[in-house]
Amino acid sequence: MPNISIAFDLYGTLLSTDAISDQVAEMCGDETKAKQITSLWRRYQLEYSWRITAMGIYRPFADITEAALKHAAAEAGVPLSTEAVAALQRSYDALSVYGDVEQGLRQLESERREGGRDVRCFIFSNGTAAAVSASVASSPTLSRYAAVFEKPPLSVEAVGAFKPASAVYDHLVAEATASRSGSGGSGGDGAVGVDDVWLVTANPFDVVGARASGIKVVWIDRAGTGWIDRLGEVIGTDIGPTHIEAGVHEAVLRILYSYV
């Protein structure tokens, strides 16, 4: 069986940002406003990353996240102190995993230990390598399975652009297919073919960006809405996920069973 590489998006795929709304509510004292701020924060976080990439400029994701939070709070009419902004920024280093994640990581740990092939796993994120490493270290679940993932994590900072820029996915493919000495599995040298690189993500923009670059993708559809993104139709190739699953564990099984 071939060696395979599986990349996992971090924020919103492995780690849940749902608890952030509760922290915002504690600070502003209004649950409705807190939900509005949290929703706008994520919206502007992504929008800013896309805009700055389109301008050919790069700044760390933490800087964009902070600016997006200030924008969201201002739009909601809720003043946030410098201390509150800093505290909410730190919340990204204290996120919990989704309930479907640990079983998937346990499956990968078993596969890497007992399987007859090399399964390389990466965290692939808009965050800097340092920020991603901090998030993993502070997560009780991810830190317990840290050995499952290659180090350092794959960050877009290496190419100075954010998802879904094509250069980001080219970087993923280059790293995920690189040979490494001393690897197990049937490949001998640890080499992975381009056709055996997978991305697991809950973000539709990530799906379309990766598929446009020829990467297989399992989309995590926790809301059960089905695939409704239509940008693939605009591109002209009707791009969509390779597979759709309800959680990370199901995604891992789908990928591994594709080679049975």
Q: Can you say where each PLM-predicted feature lies in the sequence?
A:
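Substrate-recognition element of Asp-dependent hydrolases with the DxDx(T/V) motif
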Residues: 83-94, 101-140, 152-156
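Active-site neighborhood of HAD-like aspartate-dependent phosphohydrolases
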Residues: 1-46
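A metal-dependent, Asp-based hydrolase signature
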Residues: 35, 43, 47-88
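A short acidic, helix-capping loop that chelates divalent metal ions and anchors anionic groups
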Residues: 23-24, 49-54, 227-228
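An amphipathic alpha-helix signature
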Residues: 21, 25, 38, 42, ...
